[in-house]
């Protein structure tokens, strides 16, 4: 009886196997778990009569020791709206009594995997009312007014420096929405999802 020939097997190209493995294996930042906590917050962009912006040197995480607009997280367990949250934070941190009509929704920012710990959704409000008095120190940090041209020289979060501040100024008086896919070593990927120019100021 004649034996059948065994089917030929494909040969492995060992020269290319390294490249194949690199293509197959994601980077450590691409396997970031998507089940991170998702937090919703507001930021308040307040100005005085001279056009200086009020910033908070944060005493709490995240971004401890960095300058950023004041604000805080929504009370999601009671269904708090972003506008109500912004008014509450203005009163708690700065002693300002605001209502939603005093706020202009300047932008919405979503961040995937910020610092590898949290997904964020942030509502950016410009306060229409001028702030004349510097708020006193607060457990969240200390306040100071800065002219626009000084902000770049401050210690501010990388995402603020990369796009949030530039887009805030570019679309001031209008609106913008953007998404940031945060990576390690400040290699962030930004997508501007919507924008409308405003009057600017």
Please report, for each region that a protein language model flagged, where it lies by residue:
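Extreme N-terminal basic, low-complexity initiation segments
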Residues: 2-10
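Conserved N-terminal beta-strand and adjoining loop/helix that marks the start
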Residues: 28-54
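Conserved hydrophobic/aromatic beta-strand scaffold that supports enzyme active sites
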Residues: 45, 55, 122-126, 145
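Active-site-adjacent beta-strand/loop module that shapes the phosphate/pyrophosphate-binding cleft
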Residues: 50, 111-134, 165-171
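Conserved Nudix-box catalytic region and its N-terminal flanking loop in Nudix hydrolases
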Residues: 52-91, 188-201
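NUDIX/MutT-family hydrolases
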Residues: 126, 135-167, 188-196
């Amino acid at each position: 009886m004649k034996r059948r020939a065994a089917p030929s097997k494909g040969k492995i190209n060992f020269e290319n196997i390294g490249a194949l493995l690199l293509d197959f294996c994601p980077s450590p930042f691409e396997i970031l778990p998507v089940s991170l906590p998702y937090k919703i917050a507001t930021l308040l962009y307040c100005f005085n009569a001279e056009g200086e912006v009020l910033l908070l040197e944060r005493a709490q995480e995240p971004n401890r020791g960095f300058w950023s607009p004041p604000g805080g997280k929504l009370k999601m367990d009671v269904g708090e709206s972003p506008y109500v949250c912004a008014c509450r934070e203005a009163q708690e941190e700065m002693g300002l009594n605001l209502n939603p009509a005093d706020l202009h929704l300047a932008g919405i920012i979503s961040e995937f995997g910020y610092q590898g710990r949290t997904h964020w959704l942030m509502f950016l409000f410009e306060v229409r009312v001028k702030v004349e008095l510097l708020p006193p120190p607060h457990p969240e940090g200390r306040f100071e007014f800065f002219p626009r041209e000084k902000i770049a020289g401050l210690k501010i979060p990388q995402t603020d420096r990369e796009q949030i501040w530039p887009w805030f100024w570019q679309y001031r008086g209008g609106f913008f929405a953007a998404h940031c896919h945060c990576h390690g070593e400040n290699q962030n990927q930004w997508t501007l999802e919507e924008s409308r120019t405003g009057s600017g100021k």
